[in-house]
Amino acid sequence: AAADVAALAAKLRPAAIVADSSFVLPVLPPCTAPLVLHLHNLEGGVFARPGATRRPLTERLTRYFEARTITGAEARMLGAAALAITVSDLDRTAALALAPGVRAVTVPVTVDLDRLPLLPPAPASSVPIRVLFVGTIDYPPNFEAVEELVTQHLPVLRAAFPGLVARLVGRDDAGRLAVFRGCEGVEVIGTVDDVKPHYAVAHAVYLPIRTGGGTRGKIIEAWALGRPVLATAIAAEALAGVEGRHWRRFETPLQGAQELREVLGGGAAELVRAGRALAVEQYRHPVAFAALRAAVQSVTAGR
């Protein structure tokens, strides 16, 4: 693959080479053109983060050495890059820590608001009360969050709100959600073509995420569609939203139940208003497209 990329670069003689994520670093050709790194995560930091559950010793050691290797590769390429594009200011700070001299800009993940209209609220009195988890289930941090939701949070939520259900939606090529089929209070949906009908019947998005990185597109999606977001600090760490204004934080099942009670008791309206406004202001596609265009043109100008 590396030889093919090198041959293509030699043939095209591009004005710049854009490396889209850390995972393509091993196949980058020797750079005769300016290098732009588009980093969706600082992957070394993601690998170094502890899991939601304690992993076996061999797996922890493997991840430790993988994290060091990836971080080293990221640092070297950041040092050689003409520009680094990160998806959050949090990742930009991490990139500057690895390569203090790099020119780095933030261009956030965005959504197509034309396809994500503001939905009418789900009535607080409607039955059942439904919390929604949306995310790619094949991504380990998401599956770990689903496990925690079903095994730890759902019993507490159902004790506080009898009849409550948790709906699980997201690409599940490996069929990992099958283990939750038949669990009381769990609606296993899996892969769908359109997420909007599932947001439409949800009272809140509930995200007990403990690991991973980058920007949580699922939160931006919920803001756009007008659903209150309940999440851990890690779930929302890279976003511009303010805790208490754009989303509500929980770290334990009891806290989650209390925050849901506040939302159902009238707190949803302000969260929805603020979340949609933030999505319109910062997280719509035209904002990102303009920023990406300007960033790349700043590197290729005069070439």
Residue ranges and their predicted role:
Residues 82, 185, 200-214, 225-227:
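Acidic donor-binding loop of glycosyltransferase active sites
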Residues 1-25, 58-80:
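Conserved nucleotide-sugar donor-binding subdomain of glycosyltransferases
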Residues 110-119, 123-182, 188-201:
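Conserved catalytic-core segment of nucleotide-activated headgroup transferases in glycan assembly
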Residues 44, 63-118:
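Donor nucleotide-sugar binding/catalytic pocket of nucleotide-sugar-dependent glycosyltransferases
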Residues 269-297:
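A charged, aromatic-enriched C-terminal amphipathic alpha-helix characteristic of glycosyltransferases
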